Amino acid sequence: MKTSILILAAGLGTRMKSQKPKVLQELCQKSMILHILKKAFALSDDVSVVLSHQKERVEKEILEHFPKTQILEQDLQNYPGTAGALRGFEPKNERVLILCGDMPLVEQTSLEALLGNNAKLNLAVFKARDSKSYGRVVIKDDGVEKIVEFKDANAREREINTCNAGVYVIDSRLLKELLPLIDNNNAAKEYYLTDIVKLAKEKDVMIKAVFVDEDEFMGINDKFELSIAENFMQEKIKKYWMQQGVIFHLPQSTFIGVDVKFVGECEVYENVRIGGKSKIINSIIKSSSVIENSIVENSDVGPLAHLRPNCELKNTHIGNFVECKNANLNAVKAGHLSYLGDCEIDSGTNIGCGTITCNYDGVKKYKTIIGKNVFVGSDTQFIAPVKIEDEVIIAAGSTVSVNVEKGALFINRTGHKIIKNYYYKKFQK
């Protein structure tokens, strides 16, 4: 049976206390709504999102990554609430999966289990450790009797710890029949989607409760819950990669972006941050290093190194306090305290301490190209654009602003001068 998916993302998100819409808050370097959409499109080709607050901003983010998403707009002024969000929604398939845009931890396998039940109305529920302000689910004879919103629950109903996760699977025809019957006769004067349970019961529809994991189905409403959710996601990411053979030393101290990939035998030490679409292949990343959108193959990086975006390292050693950006390094050694930006450096080359590629003139950036088996002495500056051919020696303390031919020695120090007894003349009273 084919399924249409509707994601509710029209809320104001005031508890997040941010100018950024709630569903655009990031977990592991990806917006909440994008986490949900990835799982939704894995299950269906008919996916819609309901927006309202900062609609244009959220819509732009969604369509940039998932251009086939259908965007709907909720009239919050006249039809507030979760049922109000469904006005104008026309599913293409026989049933509808309704999700919340602030549930980025939900796994595809859990949604598949929910869809595996053939009841006309299924809802995800969980046993809450702390029921807080969740809607309470009253279950009787293996079926759902009703859902009571916290604001409308009496003292006895508030003692129930079976709570509504806010995720539903409903027959499309049943939804079309019952949705117009939902009113706003409640404390909040909102149109509650939960009322569809009561209406379905009145028509003797069997309603099935599917128990799910509370942590996985948590809704994120503020920055504290955002941090909790990101910790959960980090644990999942690192657990997955450890099961694939990656070694993490003190994994709780490292941050791995959701789009990062590891290949082969890799080792990651404490306090490392790897983000973007970085790919680490058979490499060691040592303590307190940062890697952003870069490829590292058969190399070791760090400690205390920084690979900014668009670096590609192969068979290379990058030591402490070395920063690279937009750098292609093949079998290179850069042991310490250097900046290598907008450059290509070939095999066998050694970069001395304090080397800088001066790539920016205040308007435009330029490239430094260094060939094979070049020895670069300490405290060297390359004034780009500049090309150093193979088997060149650059003397320590050089400022290189011209191309250097193969096999040459480059040196441009000024002559030295020694003034005897100068110290005593300057400081003697």
From Swiss-Prot:
GO terms for molecular function: glucosamine-1-phosphate N-acetyltransferase activity; magnesium ion binding; UDP-N-acetylglucosamine diphosphorylase activity. Homotrimer. In the N-terminal section; belongs to the N-acetylglucosamine-1-phosphate uridyltransferase family. In the C-terminal section; belongs to the transferase hexapeptide repeat family. This is Bifunctional protein GlmU. It catalyses: alpha-D-glucosamine 1-phosphate + acetyl-CoA = N-acetyl-alpha-D-glucosamine 1-phosphate + CoA + H(+); N-acetyl-alpha-D-glucosamine 1-phosphate + UTP + H(+) = UDP-N-acetyl-alpha-D-glucosamine + diphosphate. InterPro entries: Bifunctional_GlmU, GlmU-like, Hexapep, MobA-like_NTP_Trfase, Nucleotide-diphossugar_trans, Trimer_LpxA-like_sf. Pfam families: Hexapep (PF00132), NTP_transf_3 (PF12804). Residues 245-429 are annotated as: N-acetyltransferase. Transmembrane segments: none annotated. UDP-N-acetyl-alpha-D-glucosamine binds at residues 8-11, 22, 74, 81-82, 135, 149, 164, 221, 308, 325, 339, 350. The active site is at H336 (proton acceptor). It comes from Campylobacter jejuni subsp. doylei (strain ATCC BAA-1458 / RM4099 / 269.97). Residues 224-244 are annotated as: Linker. The gene is glmU.
